[in-house]
Regions:
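N-terminal Rossmann-like NAD(P) cofactor-binding module of classical short-chain dehydrogenase/reductase
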Residues: 66-67, 93
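Glycine-rich, N-terminal phosphate-binding loop of Rossmann-like dinucleotide-binding domains
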Residues: 70-71, 96, 149
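Interdomain hinge/lid region at the active-site interface
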Residues: 213-281
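Phosphate-coordination loops involved in phosphoryl transfer and adenosine-cofactor binding
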Residues: 2-4, 89, 142
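NAD(P)+-binding Rossmann beta1-loop-alpha1 motif at the extreme N-terminus of oxidoreductases
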Residues: 1-62
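Rossmann-like NAD(P)(H) cofactor-binding subdomain of soluble oxidoreductases
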Residues: 78-133
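Internal alpha-helical scaffold of NAD(P)-dependent oxidoreductase catalytic cores
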Residues: 139-230
């Protein structure tokens, strides 16, 4: 059913998708495109893709499935260009970390009888640093891959079959698939993905202010410090779009954390501190 795949964006996720597909047994053609030529060359050398496309739109036209593996606003831009030129024999999917704006664009540009299908996706997998050189065939193994499909989508029999086939390949890559409403998706990931990132960013920035001129003090913190600040190495270029497209949900989560920290600060010498540790321990056990 799926013989040709175009991966638009050969950074960490795009390259990992190509490698994971090969590891899962995909034998069709995989074409890659990247805004920066070096990323595509690295993906090609790693055998995540078979060829490099000069034009992303042409690569999409010549494929059965197009995977958008670029930041969210770049995804939205590509959707605007692809929607009018792809027919009902095509599937477009993405790996973006927020879904509401992408689903709104998909309803307007895709999922109509004479147009390509669009399946919004979000693999809950990644690393603190990006780039094709860090591509990993096992990145999605054991991870959750979220879908926020529109139950009212109108699809041809062929594009519906492509959707089913892509879901099967995601499972073959080792992921567990879960379907969510896009609004609920964005609320949920604000807590379980975006909040941890912004906590790590704030903590790392604070420590840089406090001890950045004494790098030997970083070693004093040991493993706990390294684990808490690992995500502080994440690139702004990716998280900017997440912050811009999920602002309200992230603000809600950050405000709740601010209030919790204030509560903790005020109870450092009361029995409430034990309650907080017990609640935290319960979360880690369950």
């Amino acid at each position: 059913m799926i013989e040709r795949i175009a991966i638009l964006g050969t950074g960490l996720l795009g390259t990992s998708v190509g490698l994971a597909l090969r590891a899962a047994g995909f034998r069709g053609a995989i074409t890659g495109w990247n805004r920066g030529a070096e990323g595509a060359q690295v993906a090609l050398a790693a055998k995540a893709i078979d060829s490099i496309a000069a034009d992303p739109l042409q690569a999409a036209r010549e494929s059965d499935v197009t995977v958008l593996a670029v930041p969210i606003y770049a995804t939205l831009d590509l959707m605007e260009q692809l929607g009018p030129i792809l027919g009902c024999d095509h599937l477009v999917t993405d790996v973006g970390s927020t879904k509401r704006k992408i689903c709104e664009a998909a309803a307007r540009l895709f999922n109509q009888r004479d147009r390509a299908a669009f399946l919004p996706g979000h693999p809950m997998a990644g690393k603190e640093r990006g780039g094709a050189a860090l591509g990993d065939a096992g990145l999605f193994r054991g991870a959750v891959w979220l879908f926020t499909d529109d139950p009212a989508a109108e699809r041809s029999a062929h594009s519906a079959a492509l959707v089913k086939a892509w879901r099967e390949w995601v499972a073959a890559m080792g992921s567990k698939t879960i379907d969510l409403d896009p609004v609920r998706h964005d609320e949920l990931v604000a807590w379980v993905s975006h909040l941890p990132q912004f906590v790590a960013t704030a903590l790392s920035a604070l420590l840089q202010d406090e001890v950045g001129d004494a790098p030997e003090l970083k070693d004093v913190g040991g493993r706990g410090l390294r684990e808490m600040t690992r995500l502080g190495a994440s690139p702004f270029s990716m998280w900017r779009d997440i912050a811009y497209t999920n602002t309200e949900a992230v603000q809600t989560a950050l405000l709740a954390l601010e209030q919790r920290l204030a509560h903790l600060r005020e109870n450092l010498r009361t029995p409430v501190l034990r309650d907080e540790f017990e609640q935290a321990n319960r979360f880690r056990r369950e």
